[in-house]
UniProtKB/Swiss-Prot annotation:
Belongs to the peptidase M17 family. Its cofactor is Mn(2+). GO terms for cellular component: cytoplasm. InterPro entries: Leucine_aapep/pepB, Macro_dom-like, Peptidase_M17_C, Peptidase_M17_leu_NH2_pept, Peptidase_M17_N. The active site is at K274, R348. Binds 2 manganese ions per subunit. The gene is pepA. Its main location: cytoplasm. This is Probable cytosol aminopeptidase.
Length: 500
């Protein structure tokens, strides 16, 4: 993780000259740098060079390196900030990520950033660089050049007091460290991360920051009649686990907010076997659980004044002679029976018991579940654009949508309606786990299924199948696991539910 620190702009050019590279911003169409006088004496010369490049006009994320401004003067990298009226927290985050990527590509060890912004924007520039610096490279025997980390230190010069910016950044850093943990968990191969080992990893990592963690085995789940969850894992040599995480930062009388995550550490599809092509991606079918771990760690690390509980069901959906069969009927913890017609629609079975368990044990004020639940949501909303949101509560749904827009982790609401219920009615059980009546609406019927295991509690289901993994990378996330949901939920909690 890159080291990020902050100084005041009045520190001046003498401090800047000690760095390898100076990064300075410019708004689109502007005739001056956003340096607030820190580069006094050099501004005109830099602008003369900038104006000489017709291809550079300060559009968002454009980069122009200037070498040899003067003898022994640092390399200057000018970065476009786009239109000034559009430059906000999310744009700042992306600028920080672009700066990190460009400087690391140039093999620069350290740099200073001079952008005339307020404390919140400055902190987010640093945070964007931090988020983009994630590397999952533990299994390389020799680091290839493209996987090497060169940029280790960034100093941001802000017009705000350094202490103020640092305090804001430290809260963001706590969130970022949790996102890194979530990304790392999702990136782990399934021979390393499976229910037993994953549960132990969660215990070790979250105990460090003050989260109370309990790990429950299959005997405990059998005693609680969690047969929908256990049925998914019965074809695997890996034993299923239920992990409960608790953070009590609010008033003792306050009911907790609950986060529930699907943790299928590898999904073969079971007897309803997936095609071999692309099955390697199914290690990320536990991304919802990783996001729950991430938000619980974030709340504890920044000492959030809220009570929260996280519950994740951990299973491996594999195939052996004892594997669940299409047409099996299981009894869920709620007492409702489920005809399992497709063993590859397993995530909803895990969540059915996890949701019911959470309500019964903790009486939460609201529940949010996260799951890579359906491929259909990717068909509807695409990759890395929006997660699907389903809810029985308009107010909480709207709060999450606002938090998504503010954090950049956007949500699109899809319908729940009793008209879809008939699609999952079974002829021999209370319900079936897929629709066999026509085609389409698979994400909706999955959410409609989950709603049958919500007993009067305000609830939101987030289908993050299109958001958990990025095949190309973004300004703030390299190719691979995204840690989607941690920033969204942290904003949601801090904006609407935390005591300030």
């Amino acid at each position: 993780m890159i080291n990020v620190s902050f100084l005041g702009l009045m520190s001046g050019i003498s401090v800047l000259l000690k760095t390898t590279v100076i990064v300075v911003g410019i708004f689109e169409g502007s005739n001056h740098l956003e340096d607030n006088g820190a580069l006094e004496g050099y501004n005109d010369k830099i602008m003369e060079i900038v104006n000489g490049y017709q291809s550079f006009d300060g559009k968002f994320a454009e980069v122009l390196p200037i070498i040899g401004l003067e003898k022994d003067f640092p390399v200057v990298v000018v970065i476009g900030l786009g239109k000034s009226e559009d430059f906000d927290e999310n744009k700042a985050l992306k600028v920080g990520g672009v700066i990190y990527s460009e400087l690391n590509r140039m093999k620069i060890p350290d740099a200073s950033i001079v952008i005339n912004t307020d404390s919140n924007v400055s902190a987010n520039i640093g945070y964007g660089a931090l988020l983009r610096s994630f590397k999952f490279d533990k299994y390389f025997v020799e680091k290839k050049d493209k996987n090497s980390v060169y940029l280790n230190k960034l100093v941001l010069f802000s017009k705000s007091e350094p202490q103020e910016v640092t305090a804001l950044f430290n809260d963001l850093k706590a969130e970022g460290e949790s996102i890194f943990l979530a990304r790392s968990f999702v990136s782990e191969p399934p021979n390393i991360l499976y229910p037993e080992t994953y549960a132990q990893m969660i215990y070790e990592e979250l105990s460090k920051v003050g989260v109370t963690v309990e790990v429950f085995d299959e005997d405990y789940m059998k005693a609680n009649q969690m047969m929908a969850l256990l049925g998914v894992g019965q074809g695997s040599a890996k034993k299923s686990r239920l992990v409960v995480m608790k953070w009590n930062g609010g008033d003792e009388s306050e009911s907790p907010i609950a986060f529930v995550g699907k943790g299928v550490t590898f999904d073969t599809g079971g007897i309803s076997l997936k095609p071999s092509k692309g099955m390697w991606d199914m290690k990320y079918d536990m991304a919802g659980s990783a996001s729950v771990v991430g938000i619980m760690r974030t709340l504890a690390a920044r000492k959030a004044k809220v009570n929260a509980v996280g519950v994740v069901g951990l299973v491996e959906n594999s195939v052996d002679g004892n594997a669940q069969r299409p047409s099996d009927v299981v009894i869920s913890m709620s007492g409702q029976t489920i005809e399992v017609l497709n063993t590859d629609a397993e995530g909803r079975l895990v969540l059915a018991d996890a949701l019911w368990y959470t309500q019964e044990m903790f009486t939460p004020k609201l529940m949010v579940d996260l799951a890579t639940l359906t491929g259909a949501v990717v068909v509807a909303l695409g990759n890395n654009q929006y997660a699907g949101l389903f809810s029985n509560d308009d107010a909480i749904a709207n709060q999450l949508i606002v938090a998504g827009n503010e954090s950049g982790e956007k949500l699109w609401r899809l319908p729940l309606d009793e008209a879809y219920d008939k699609l999952i009615d079974s002829s021999i059980a209370d319900m079936q786990n897929i629709s066999t009546k026509g085609y389409g609406a698979d994400s909706i019927t999955a959410a409609q299924f989950l709603q049958r295991f919500v007993n009067g509690v305000p609830w939101v289901h987030l289908d993050i199948a299109g958001m958990a993994w990025d095949y190309e990378g973004t300004e703030i996330c390299p190719k691979g696991a995204t840690g989607f949901g941690v920033r969204l939920l942290n904003r949601f909690v801090s904006k609407y539910y935390e005591s300030h």
